Amino acid sequence: MAAVILAVAICVALVSAPLAAQEKVEEVRPPKLNYTTHKLANGLEVILLEDHAVPIINLQVWYHVGSKDEPPGHTGFAHLFEHLMFKGSAHVAAEEHSRIIESVGGFDNAETNDDTTNFFETFPSNYLERLLWLEADRMGSLNVSEANFKSEREVVKEERRVRVENQPYGYLQEDLRAAAFTVHGYHHTPIGSMEDLDKATIQDVRDFFNTYYKPNNATLVIVGDFESAQALAWTKKYFDGIPASAKPIPRLDNPEPPQTAERVVKKSYSNTPLPAVVIGYKIPARYAPDAYPLDLASNILAGGESSRLYQTLVYKEQIAVQAAGFGAFSEDPNLFWAYAIMNQGHTAEEGEKALVEVLDGLKTAPVDAKELEKAKNQEISGFVLGRDTDQEKAEALASAAVIGKNPALANTELGHYLTISPDDIQRVAKEYFALQHATVLIVTPAAPAQ
């Protein structure tokens, strides 16, 4: 814990003093995660990291199935199972999983993304055996009943109405992704479509569970106050009896073809008060070498109100009320998003031109040392503060293991950022921020109904 406090103190000092020498920045490292890995006979990957600072444990199960694995006509299934996994199993009643955790002072949650579906819980360390039993029970005997399926389908549909259909600019992500990806599963979002959810059958849903929710498609991570030998023994006790899938886990063979020309899509939304523009540039996968300088470039371009996009479009030119961006770094190549919501009297086309000019600025001149060091300091801050809790450590290990195929990446990733030079930023900007690799979504408010 003292090492963490010291690292955080150094990190804060660096962020507040961006003119510090570069060699000082490169000395900073978060504490190493001294984990062990194990593989059960049924293929379950197990990662253990002891941390005896407090009597708490974070346990996570990541299933290597996300929305990109959904075949056409079955969108939303991965997210649906995020909900169904709480509806009971052979020995646990519906919603009882969470109630048991809450009754001992813990908490749990889940999330679905393009690549994975993740379940996580934090609880007092003396309940580890019970929690392993709970996770094994729903992995091996989930109650995928007609009643559960229909009730959770309605919950998911309502979530879609709230998050997408009734939200200003709620369709931006769906429309840009649909245009940017013609073949790959990133074409659609995890929430799925109403049409696919409505036509889904109970057999479709059971087939999806029986295909992907298997121990040989899962990674179990335990971080906190436990003894590894005992934790591994309990894991084998409760998970060994769950059979692996009889066939290899299917993966859609749908790589996105190279994009060689700009695509422009124009949409009008009735619940959109102001014009907007979104540009999606194709970028490499999460742990690819070029992902690191692109991530720093994303910070320089869109890392808060001091970033180039906000300062130019909102503060100086005042043509937009919001301007930002982010890199969607995923298991497969995805998109860097740059977007602007325009001010009154300004068009989305103006916004597109301004966004492109700001991104082109990274191509024409290397970033100066001060700006690059600030971005690196923010990266260090994120890494150090992002290892402060057992949950954050578990997430780092799980992501590296499932998405990066190597948990050791959790310990080596920061080093990639610290060696990035201004020339590296300029090189990746030239290669990836090119309009022939971009999809542009132009949004205008729909005319009021007469």
Task: Give residue spans per PLM region.
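A common structural junction motif
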Residues: 136-146, 238-246, 317, 356-367
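Non-catalytic accessory/assembly modules
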Residues: 147-151, 167-174, 382, 402, ...
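Non-catalytic, conformational "gating/processing" segments within enzyme and secreted inhibitor domains
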Residues: 153, 206-238, 437-438
